Amino acid sequence: MNEKSYRILKRPLVTEKSTTEKDEHNKLFFEVDRRANKIEIKEAVEQIFKVDVLDVATMNVRGKKKRVGRYFTKRADRKKAMVTIKPGQRVEFFEGV
């Protein structure tokens, strides 16, 4: 396995919506490196989880502005990926969530 694959996928996004999408449409959600492209994300998911990826959709999320005392600060920007896997395949990491 390539070490670069682990740098591309930062963490899984587990929300109520992502759990529903996983169960109904075989879609997995990840927070990924902001510089990663769809091809790199697809290869990383296939290498790490041993599944066949059909589609990858990415979205850039701008960080929110938050107030700290009398000053404003900004949270970090991030990138999310929605990965569709082949029907019938499962990722054990996400089972039971």
Curated annotation (Swiss-Prot):
One of its GO terms (molecular function) is rRNA binding. GO terms for cellular component: ribonucleoprotein complex; ribosome. One of the early assembly proteins it binds 23S rRNA. One of the proteins that surrounds the polypeptide exit tunnel on the outside of the ribosome. Forms the main docking site for trigger factor binding to the ribosome. Signal peptide: none annotated. Belongs to the universal ribosomal protein uL23 family. This is Large ribosomal subunit protein uL23. The gene is rplW. GO terms for biological process: translation. Part of the 50S ribosomal subunit. Contacts protein L29, and trigger factor when it is bound to the ribosome. HAMAP family: Ribosomal_uL23_B. Pfam families: Ribosomal_L23. Gene3D superfamilies: 3.30.70.330. InterPro entries: Nucleotide-bd_a/b_plait_sf, Ribosomal_uL23-like, Ribosomal_uL23/eL15/eS24_sf. It comes from Syntrophobacter fumaroxidans (strain DSM 10017 / MPOB). PANTHER family: 60S RIBOSOMAL PROTEIN L23A.
